[in-house]
């Protein structure tokens, strides 16, 4: 007789709170990738990117811009989430972020971080400013693609 290997299957059951959190994150991904959000965020950054300088010192105007950004972007995301999840509570979601920090996709986490972390907000503006001023590194110029296996091309013309 054949020896049958025993297979173990593990069923992962998440709590209702975890499922709710995952649902909110999924909706946030949709909102952030949507053209309406992209236009809102880029329009705001276009308006203020020239104010930011890459120095240790932070201008007082940064605080005003930061507070305006939080009001505009957080409000937009919250309104969009309420349309999708009528019982959504932003305060409860933000407090549950610490428990799920490792589970959140990079883009979502970066956006959320700009609501609470001023340095992340400033870095976002400095990156945007560098891009607008053409100071980003374009790696495509120096890339050369060569085959790993030498191909023999016969030149029998």
Swiss-Prot record:
The keyword Ubl conjugation is assigned to this record: no
Pfam family, one: ARL2_Bind_BART
Keyword Mitochondrion found: yes
Chain coiled-coil ranges: none
Intracellular or extracellular location(s): Cytoplasm; Mitochondrion intermembrane space; Cytoplasm, Cytoskeleton, Microtubule organizing center, Centrosome; Nucleus
Keyword terms, alphabetized: Cell projection, Cilium, Cytoplasm, Cytoskeleton, Mitochondrion, Nucleus
GO cellular component, one term: cilium
Family of this protein: Belongs to the ARL2BP family.
Function: Plays a role as an effector of the ADP-ribosylation factor-like protein 2, ARL2.
Entry protein name: ADP-ribosylation factor-like protein 2-binding protein
Species this protein is from: Xenopus tropicalis
């Amino acid at each position: 007789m054949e020896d049958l290997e025993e297979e173990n299957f593990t069923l992962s059951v998440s709590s209702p709170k975890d499922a709710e959190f995952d649902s909110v994150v999924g909706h946030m991904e949709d909102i952030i990738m949507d053209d309406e959000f992209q236009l809102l965020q880029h329009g705001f950054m276009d308006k203020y990117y020239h104010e930011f300088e890459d120095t240790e010192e932070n201008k007082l105007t940064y605080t005003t811009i930061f507070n305006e950004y939080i009001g505009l972007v957080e409000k937009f995301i919250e309104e969009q989430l309420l349309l999708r999840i009528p019982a959504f509570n932003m305060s409860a979601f933000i407090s549950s972020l610490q428990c799920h920090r490792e589970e959140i996709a990079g883009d979502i986490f970066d956006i959320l971080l700009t609501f609470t972390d001023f340095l992340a907000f400033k870095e976002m503006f400095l990156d945007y400013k560098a891009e607008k001023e053409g100071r980003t590194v374009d790696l495509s110029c120096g890339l050369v693609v060569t085959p790993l296996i030498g191909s023999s091309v016969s030149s029998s013309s």
